[in-house]
Amino acid sequence: MIDRTELSKFGITTQLSVIGRNPDEQSGFVNPPLYKGSTIILKKLSDLEQRKGRFYGTAGSPTIDNLENAWTHLTGGAGTVLSASGLGSISLALLALSKAGDHILMTDSVYVPTRMLCDGLLAKFGVETDYYDPSIGKDIEKLVKPNTTVIFLESPGSGTMEVQDIPALVSVAKKHGIKTILDNTWATPLFFDAHAHGIDISVEAGTKYLGGHSDLLIGLASANEECWPLLRSTYDAMAMLPGAEDCQLALRGMRTLHLRLKEVERKALDLAAWLGNRDEVEKVLHPAFEDCPGHEYWVRDYKGSSGLFSIVLKNGFTRAGLEKMVEGMKVLQLGFSWGG
């Protein structure tokens, strides 16, 4: 059996085969069992009174622990908390690092539900949000206010696909004592190491590539040493944990994540190149293409590209024509998710 303290010396294939598994604690079975339940039997009255250890189903389970520990290893963070969706993890991260009277700088290319969270719930709680150009780089310093507590990044951006200059943004944040949150769903930890690049909290919708089969909803948030207590205490207060079955499916998906990402990358690049030669297409927005905004940062910072990209159609395309095209497709279908 591999010594887990030396696991990082091995390749990613070996690591993904080992993390989240503890045969010695499971009667020799390779995969962890599925733990479902709400009530947990405690031996002492003092344990019940002090909420010591695992005292109720909302405090997690061995199934959840296995996935959290595996993701912490993969991200290099100090700890991980799970939630029932990617948006749930984004919410946890923002709530952990902001309070009434604080100011957040949010990339203008952010996932629309994240924008709705900021403009709705957080605004109601007294948190101010300003949106910045995702290509701003070090000039974001001009937007920093005395009460700015968070810079939120999403790279590449939703729809518009700009790759951000993450080291430049992190440098400004650290200079002013501001925390950084990155939505790393597109790249996953395999293609971008968020914490190694100075990000404080990295969030991901595991619904996409970690699950990979369109049959689960799960979010993950990993934090560095400084932000981990804040993230964990926020999670404990809100009990936003996912279902046990989704955790088990996510653990299964983790075993083949590296294989699926590479195949997704290959197929997406082929499709993007084909679309780029179509008369109807004005531009393909794919971070691996030289004319994509921030391509140089993708080359510098990323280890690969995943499957999500955008196209810009030439002028003259009507709504009716677009409907005819997308509703007439036989293999590619309309839907709000990707990666499955």
UniProtKB/Swiss-Prot annotation:
<comment type="pathway">
    <text>Amino-acid biosynthesis; L-methionine biosynthesis via de novo pathway; L-homocysteine from L-cystathionine: step 1/1.</text>
</comment>
<dbReference type="InterPro" id="IPR006233">
    <property type="entry name" value="Cys_b_lyase_bac"/>
</dbReference>
<dbReference type="InterPro" id="IPR000277">
    <property type="entry name" value="Cys/Met-Metab_PyrdxlP-dep_enz"/>
</dbReference>
<dbReference type="GO" id="GO:0009086">
    <property type="term" value="P:methionine biosynthetic process"/>
</dbReference>
<dbReference type="GO" id="GO:0019450">
    <property type="term" value="P:L-cysteine catabolic process to pyruvate"/>
</dbReference>
<keyword id="KW-0663">Pyridoxal phosphate</keyword>
<keyword id="KW-0456">Lyase</keyword>
<dbReference type="GO" id="GO:0030170">
    <property type="term" value="F:pyridoxal phosphate binding"/>
</dbReference>
<dbReference type="GO" id="GO:0019346">
    <property type="term" value="P:transsulfuration"/>
</dbReference>
<comment type="similarity">
    <text>Belongs to the trans-sulfuration enzymes family.</text>
</comment>
<keyword id="KW-0028">Amino-acid biosynthesis</keyword>
<protein>
    <recommendedName>
        <fullName>Putative cystathionine beta-lyase</fullName>
        <ecNumber>4.4.1.13</ecNumber>
    </recommendedName>
</protein>
<dbReference type="InterPro" id="IPR015422">
    <property type="entry name" value="PyrdxlP-dep_Trfase_small"/>
</dbReference>
<keyword id="KW-0486">Methionine biosynthesis</keyword>
<dbReference type="InterPro" id="IPR054542">
    <property type="entry name" value="Cys_met_metab_PP"/>
</dbReference>
<dbReference type="InterPro" id="IPR015424">
    <property type="entry name" value="PyrdxlP-dep_Trfase"/>
</dbReference>
<dbReference type="Pfam" id="PF01053">
    <property type="entry name" value="Cys_Met_Meta_PP"/>
</dbReference>
<dbReference type="GO" id="GO:0047804">
    <property type="term" value="F:cysteine-S-conjugate beta-lyase activity"/>
</dbReference>
<dbReference type="GO" id="GO:0006790">
    <property type="term" value="P:sulfur compound metabolic process"/>
</dbReference>
<dbReference type="InterPro" id="IPR015421">
    <property type="entry name" value="PyrdxlP-dep_Trfase_major"/>
</dbReference>
<feature type="modified residue" description="N6-(pyridoxal phosphate)lysine">
    <location>
        <position position="208"/>
    </location>
</feature>
